[in-house]
């Protein structure tokens, strides 16, 4: 594609931009964002890369969801589900729109989730995946853990789902 087309018709463009507003930010999900989030992740749900969620599921846990925006357009999402009684948190619903992949936004959201988990005071953050094994292990340096390391209620839900997800996690040393 030409530079002018890229500049005019993408959120990122190719030139220098000066403005007073935050161009790229991670913010809490708003209720009015839920339909867009569901539409955005739909293909990955069909491909079994993400767990199926509906409006009510997300609305019930809306405080756990965050979106990455570029110029006020949602380009990615992540959820941080706390399990305080197990001193752990789950990184879930990690997704970047296809045209924004390869720009480090997945890493940005994973690091954001880790910081949120640290703020919660938990000792362990984990992600469940059957398709992003190499991403979590090789790029994010998450170690592989047994399913026994999961909070009991999360383990039950995983077993009931029938998904063959691996468990990848990080011990958060600063909270010990």
Q: What spans do the regions from the language model cover?
A:
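C-terminal catalytic "cap/lid" subdomain
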Residues: 1-57, 102
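A conserved beta-strand-loop-helix scaffold within acyl/acetyltransferase catalytic domains
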Residues: 50-88, 92-96
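Conserved GNAT acetyl-CoA-binding A-motif
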Residues: 116-130
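Active-site beta-strand termini and strand-to-loop segments that position acidic
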Residues: 69-71, 170-173
């Amino acid at each position: 594609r030409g530079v002018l087309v890229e500049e005019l018709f993408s959120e990122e463009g190719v030139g220098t931009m000066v403005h007073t507003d935050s161009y790229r930010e991670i913010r809490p999900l708003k209720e009015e964002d839920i339909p867009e989030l569901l539409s955005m992740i739909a293909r990955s749900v069909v491909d079994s890369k993400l767990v199926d969620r509906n409006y009510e599921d997300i609305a019930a846990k809306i405080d756990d969801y965050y979106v990455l925006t570029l110029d006020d357009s949602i380009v990615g999402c992540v959820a941080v589900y706390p399990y305080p009684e197990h001193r752990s948190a789950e990184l879930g619903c990690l997704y970047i729109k296809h045209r924004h992949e390869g720009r480090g936004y997945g890493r940005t959201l994973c690091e954001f989730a880790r910081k949120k988990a640290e703020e919660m005071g938990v000792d362990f953050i984990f992600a469940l995946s059957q398709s992003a094994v190499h991403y979590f292990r090789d790029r994010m340096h998450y170690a592989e853990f047994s399913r026994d390391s999961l909070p009991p209620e999360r383990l039950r839900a995983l077993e009931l789902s029938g998904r063959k997800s691996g468990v990848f996690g990080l011990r958060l040393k600063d909270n010990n």
